[in-house]
Amino acid sequence: MEGKEEDVRLGANKFSERHAIGTAAQGTDDKDYKEPPPAPLFEPGELKSWSFYRPGIAEFVATFLFLYISILTVMGVSKSTSKCATVGIQGIAWSFGGMILALVYCTAGISGHINPAVTFGLFLARKLSLTRAVFYIIMQCLGAICGRGVVKGFQQGLYMGNGGRRNVVAPGYTKGDGLGAEIVGTFILVYTVFSATDAKRRARDSHVPILAPLPIGFAVFLVHLATMGITGTGINPARSLGAAVIYNQHHAWADHWIFWVGPFIGAALAAIYHQVIIRAIPFKSRS
């Protein structure tokens, strides 16, 4: 019967947590960190506070800069008659990943999401309120639309001639293929975000907060390398929305649902996996 009791309790409270070899956690107490309390669904009075709007403005600016630089890079590759004379696929992937790395580093102290899927995943994990999540997503979408609009203004002919570099399922792939690629790609990104910002890891390894943008940027880079040939790599609904709004012709909206449904499913799966499997937070005592 004792074994069955352990199965029910999952061992979450009976055994002390083990520390990885070589980390700063060796020789510390069983729990040397404090789990932040769950965010309320609605926070009274937050709409009247300037601290509510500052992160939203940061999300707008960061998403604007993200799309501005990355899509300009794509346009530069498309413009050249010789792909060998450009940064190529790897350069495009790194422009997306590198900008995320830089912008997360710059804005992590205030928000640092730059992606509705990331915001949605963190909301499901009770890291922010519903009102903040909705506000962040709106500002991210507006930033993406403006960023795309500026790029189109610089070189409208090239932009429209290349289909606005919108996200679509590539020929030879089904909508199911595209949806699957978006789910898995977003899962990788959001899972990396959870791991890089984990409260326990941040407390036990002092260098983790400084290095957190690095794995997040590399996750974006690697997912782009893997899925650019399938969907153009969405994994960010704001980015896909900005492309559809600014281009707005020739089936710009045909596969658009994939780039919202896929990332949101991937983000939800990543949130559940990290909170339930990796951290076992629902099974820990509330003492």
Curated annotation (Swiss-Prot):
Record's protein name: Aquaporin PIP1-1
Native source species: Zea mays
A Gene Ontology biological process term: protein heterotetramerization
Entry annotated with the keyword Metal-binding: no
Membrane topology: Multi-pass membrane protein
Tissue expression profile of the protein: Highly expressed in roots, shoots and developing tassels, and at lower levels in leaves.
Domain notes: Aquaporins contain two tandem repeats each containing three membrane-spanning domains and a pore-forming loop with the signature motif Asn-Pro-Ala (NPA).
Annotated transmembrane regions: 57-77, 92-114, 134-154, 176-196, 210-230, 258-278
UniProt short sequence motif NPA 1, positions renumbered to this chain: 115-117
GO terms assigned for molecular function: water channel activity
Subcellular locations according to the entry: Cell membrane
Keyword Cell membrane: yes
